[in-house]
A protein has these predicted regions:
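Intrinsically disordered or compositionally simple regulatory linkers and C-terminal tails
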Residues: 1, 538-555
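Transmembrane helical cores of multi-pass ion-transport proteins
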Residues: 1-415, 517
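Conserved short loop/turn motifs at secondary-structure junctions
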Residues: 39, 472-475, 530-531
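Active-site-adjacent beta-strand anchor residues
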Residues: 67, 126, 502-503, 531
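The feature marks cytosolic C-terminal regulatory regions of anion transporters and related permeases
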Residues: 224, 352-516, 546-549, 553
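Short acidic-hydrophobic, aromatic-tinged amphipathic segments that line or gate anion-handling sites
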Residues: 522-537
Length: 555
């Protein structure tokens, strides 16, 4: 038995080492490129990859999750002025990473993962599609060697197209060659290493061809080094970085939740989403102190980790060690990676972020979903991403409220000649001398209260001597707006000489009926508490209603 366990352990270790090597080597150019994408020192991206991978693996629940800086998060950071330029740039970035981690930790400890379901798929697809386009447009300057003027990426791209004579064609050739080589090598046995090989090969072509005007990391003053610059956050930056930190945390948590749902743990159980939130939060706190940019669960890195044979959480830790080793051994050579080559890599990342199948699926879902998709996409293209994310969340919440409120229906329950219970449309008006049993369906909260009230039978001068029974089985709580509707309807029925009975009432609903004045309006004898017997409370209410109607004088 011990031998079997040892063999399994050896297999796991081999798988983790293999995955760690693949992930670590691939992550060096990827991390540098992500730093470039964020408009930061490329080492901020690489440090985030190193520290995020190790810390995330130690504290997340998901075995396969790899915590690194992502393209979407980098685009948000690129729109945060406080972390670009100035003497406090490093401390501002550290503060942003720390705040992002704190938000994630709060979300994890409060188990707020369930709130992500309120974000509609249309918003996510619109946002991620725009992020992909922004990634592409944001690298046009590095790809072409021409930084065109303009207030945003779209205008700068248009100005670049309109100024072909300003394009540095040698840079463009290197960038396009990188894209073509990555795509070509991915379909060979090299596989995931194709990204690394392509960037190295095209960067090496620059000095070989004598194209000294093609920009490299070294030309821009960046130095690839394993010597981490320890940085402390700045309290002064907290107020201006709260909004971008919340946006970054939201993006990371949405992407991380998708990874959690995708990969089961070694025991077959689904990972704990809240624990993954906490792990990502810890990783951000660690990167904040080590000059790294904010990090979150990376879908592409996690997929590569799993495909490369990872078995346990050791794989990302090994990858972090590999990254450090690569920087120590090859740091001086990495300094000469060509900026157009990194731009080509990022443009390919942006292109693959856009998923036409998802866009088509949302587009077919209806006009409301189309509108949400278009609005979110437009906002993300022309508004700083830190605000576009939060507006997208707001759009999702409003959309959810509108959809839920419009789904409220009211049905009348009757017995047919065979004695079966059937449901039909409620009458337009409350008929005289009858028991009318109404069953509401849908979410009964403040936004749906007007829809519910409009669906109730109208009360006229002839609506006398009747009892309307509203069945609330399964409702554990009612909003105050809905309680007000019940109170008004009860008062109208009383003025017409009729009554309102409420049945299958839970204890929580009973407290709200007392507080909202409904109990006083209908009387204690008109409230029928529910229990485990389905239909018992309704039968008692119907019997009481028929007895009350029988006692009424003829009108």
């Amino acid at each position: 038995m011990a031998g079997i366990k040892s063999l399994k352990g050896d297999r796991n270790l081999r798988g983790d080492i293999q995955a760690g090597l693949v992930l670590g080597i691939q992550s060096v150019p990827d991390g540098l490129a992500t730093g470039v994408l964020a408009g930061l020192n490329p080492m901020n991206g690489l440090y985030a990859y190193i520290v995020g991978s190790a810390a995330g693996a130690a504290f997340t629940s998901s075995t396969m999750m790899v915590v690194q800086a992502t393209g979407a998060m980098a685009m948000v950071i690129s729109d945060v002025p406080a972390v670009h330029g100035g003497n406090d740039q490093a401390r501002a970035l550290a503060t942003l990473s720390l705040l992002t981690g704190v938000v994630m930790l709060i979300a994890g400890f409060l188990k707020l993962g369930s709130l992500l379901r309120f974000v509609s798929n249309a918003v996510l697809v619109g946002f991620m599609s725009a992020v992909g386009v922004n990634i592409i447009l944001g690298q046009i300057a590095n790809l072409t060697g021409y930084a065109a003027p303009g207030d945003n990426r779209v205008i700068r791209t248009i100005n670049t197209i309109l100024s072909p004579t300003s394009i540095h064609w040698q840079s463009l050739i290197i960038g396009l060659a990188t894209i073509a080589l990555i795509v070509l090598l991915e379909h060979t046995p090299i596989g995931s290493f194709g990204l690394v090989v392509a960037v190295i090969v095209t960067s090496a072509l620059v000095p070989i061809l004598g194209w000294t005007d093609v920009a490299t990391l070294h030309d821009l003053g960046f130095q690839v080094t394993a010597a981490i610059q320890w940085t402390l956050p700045s309290i002064a930056h907290v107020p201006i970085l709260l909004v971008p930190a919340a946006s970054l945390a939201f993006i990371a948590l949405v992407q991380g939740a998708g990874i959690s749902a995708m990969y089961a743990k070694s025991d077959g159980q689904r990972p704990d989403v809240s624990r993954d939130f906490i792990g990502q939060g810890v990783a951000n706190v660690a990167t904040a102190l080590t000059a790294g940019m904010p990090v979150g669960g990376s879908a592409s890195a996690s997929a590569l980790n799993a495909a490369a044979g990872a078995k346990t959480r050791r794989a990302p830790m090994i990858a972090a060690a590999v990254m450090i080793l690569v920087v120590i051994v090859f740091g001086s050579a990495v300094d000469y990676l060509a900026m157009p080559a990194l731009a080509g890599l990022l443009i390919l990342v942006g292109y693959r972020t856009i998923r036409p199948a998802d866009i088509q699926s949302v587009w077919k879902a209806g006009n409301v979903q189309k509108a949400v998709l278009v609005v979110t996409f437009a906002l993300t293209m022309f508004v700083p991403l830190q605000y576009a994310v939060l507006v997208g969340v707001g759009v999702s919440v409003v959309l959810h409220v509108v959809q839920q409120s419009n789904q409220v229906t009211v049905r009348r329950r009757l017995k047919n000649e065979a004695g079966d219970t059937i449901e039909v449309d409620p009458p337009k008006e409350v008929p005289p001398g009858e028991v009318v049993v109404l069953q509401p369906y849908g979410s009964l909260f403040f936004a749906s209260a007007p829809v519910f009230e409009e669906a109730l039978p109208a009360i006229t001068a002839t609506s006398t001597g009747s009892v309307v029974i509203i069945r609330l089985r399964g409702r554990v709580e009612l909003g105050t707006t809905f309680v007000d509707v019940l109170a008004r309807y009860a008062a109208e029925l009383e003025r017409a000489g009729s009554r309102l009975f409420i049945v299958s009432v839970a204890s929580g609903v009973m407290r709200q009926l007392k507080t909202g004045g409904v109990l006083d309006a209908v009387g204690a004898d008109a409230i029928f508490l529910g229990d485990e017997r389905v239909g018992a409370a309704l039968a008692n209410a119907r019997e009481a209603a028929e007895a009350w109607i029988a006692q009424q004088p003829p009108r």
